[in-house]
């Protein structure tokens, strides 16, 4: 293989762990792993390690969990490892310029979009909601900006009409390691060809909120269907029926004129709950009332048919 690199890996969730797993079999030397501090989880709020820490400890790698990399003593942890490159994947902490400049070859990041489209925190969800036909991963050299660094490698994948954020996440988690290993080989061989991002094509993927997951019936059926897929599995699209929140797991578009005010129930059958939108009809197929598991429209109608009387306006 190419020259063996000394690598610091920084990441926290499962998406990052899949990249660390690929590095473990790449032949490069992982000299340290930075990951976020353990977080309370579950009903007992017990402190639990993230997937990257679990994998790193399984392979006896040195693990560091600073709350911030701004203090000088925490930056010294990075410096002391004398790394050739730092690989950052969904780490969750800001890297100050001093840290970015420490590795000989700099810091590189795996980002879940085809930059410069969808810089920011939620590129997978935003690409789905926008109706993009494809997305992918970009390996970039990090600088002090928000996903503004020069691009080193890009891999694309199609977005299908069935994709949710969960399925797209899995696709990109498989693509990313391929691009990362190839990029590291290019860096080691001195063959990397950085490409400056074109600012004319920049879009931003703002962090998701539970509030924007509430279905807005003034949008079209196509937009709402994409919203439902984009917000699955978090924070989940929802609506209010009889003053109770109901999450929507799956829906489809019926391309015909609603002939009713947006948010009005048109029909309720075993195939779904048909709701008028600003353009077309949204057919709700899988729903989850508060405190219940997700169920088909038919199962929900069996217990709550009074909720779905044609002519009822949904909030």
Swiss-Prot record:
Pfam families with a match to the protein in the record: Formyl_trans_C, Formyl_trans_N
Protein name: Methionyl-tRNA formyltransferase
Enzyme Commission number(s): 2.1.2.9
Catalytic activity annotation: L-methionyl-tRNA(fMet) + (6R)-10-formyltetrahydrofolate = N-formyl-L-methionyl-tRNA(fMet) + (6S)-5,6,7,8-tetrahydrofolate + H(+)
The species this protein was found in: Enterobacter sp. (strain 638)
Entry GO MF terms: methionyl-tRNA formyltransferase activity
Superkingdom of the source species: Bacteria
CDD domains associated with the record: FMT_core_Met-tRNA-FMT_N (cd08646), Met_tRNA_FMT_C (cd08704)
Name of the encoding gene: fmt
Cross-referenced PANTHER family: METHIONYL-TRNA FORMYLTRANSFERASE (PTHR11138), METHIONYL-TRNA FORMYLTRANSFERASE, MITOCHONDRIAL (PTHR11138:SF5)
Any Gene Ontology CC annotation: cytosol
Function: Attaches a formyl group to the free amino group of methionyl-tRNA(fMet). The formyl group appears to play a dual role in the initiator identity of N-formylmethionyl-tRNA by promoting its recognition by IF2 and preventing the misappropriation of this tRNA by the elongation apparatus.
Enzyme type, top EC level: transferase
Presence of keyword Transferase: yes
HAMAP family to which the protein is assigned, alphabetical: Formyl_trans (MF_00182)
Family as reported in the entry's similarity comment: Belongs to the Fmt family.
Record keywords: Protein biosynthesis, Transferase
PROSITE patterns: GART
Binding site for (6S)-5,6,7,8-tetrahydrofolate: 113-116
Gene3D superfamilies noted in UniProt: Formyl transferase, C-terminal domain, Formyl transferase, N-terminal domain
């Amino acid at each position: 293989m190419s020259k063996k690199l000394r690598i610091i890996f920084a990441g926290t969730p499962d998406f990052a762990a899949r990249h660390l797993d690929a590095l473990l079999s790449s032949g490069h030397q992982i000299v340290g792993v930075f990951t976020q501090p353990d977080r309370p989880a579950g009903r007992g709020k017990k402190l639990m390690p993230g997937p990257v820490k679990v994998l790193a400890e399984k392979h006896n790698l040195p693990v560091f969990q600073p709350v911030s990399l701004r203090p000088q003593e925490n930056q010294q942890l990075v410096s002391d490892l004398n790394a050739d490159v730092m690989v950052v994947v969904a780490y969750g902490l800001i890297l100050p310029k001093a840290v970015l400049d420490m590795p000989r070859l700099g810091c590189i990041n795996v980002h879940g979009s085809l930059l410069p489209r969808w810089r920011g925190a939620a590129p997978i969800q935003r690409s789905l909601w926008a109706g993009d036909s494809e997305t992918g991963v970009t390996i970039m050299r990090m600088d002090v900006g928000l996903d503004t660094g020069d691009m080193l490698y890009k891999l694309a994948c199609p977005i299908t009409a069935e994709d949710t954020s969960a399925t797209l996440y899995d696709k990109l988690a498989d693509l990313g390691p391929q691009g990362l290993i190839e990029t590291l080989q290019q860096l080691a061989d001195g063959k990397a060809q950085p490409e400056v991002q074109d600012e004319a094509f920049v879009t931003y993927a703002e962090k998701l909120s539970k509030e924007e997951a509430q279905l807005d019936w003034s949008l079209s059926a196509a937009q709402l269907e994409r919203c439902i897929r984009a917000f699955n599995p978090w924070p989940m699209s929802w609506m209010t029926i009889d003053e109770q929140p109901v999450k929507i797991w799956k829906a489809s578009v019926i391309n015909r004129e609603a002939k009713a005010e947006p948010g009005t129930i048109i029909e309720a059958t075993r195939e779904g709950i048909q709701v008028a939108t600003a353009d077309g009809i949204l057919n709700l197929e899988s729903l989850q009332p508060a405190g219940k598991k997700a169920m088909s429209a038919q199962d929900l109608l069996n217990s709550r048919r009074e909720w779905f009387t044609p002519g009822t306006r949904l909030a």
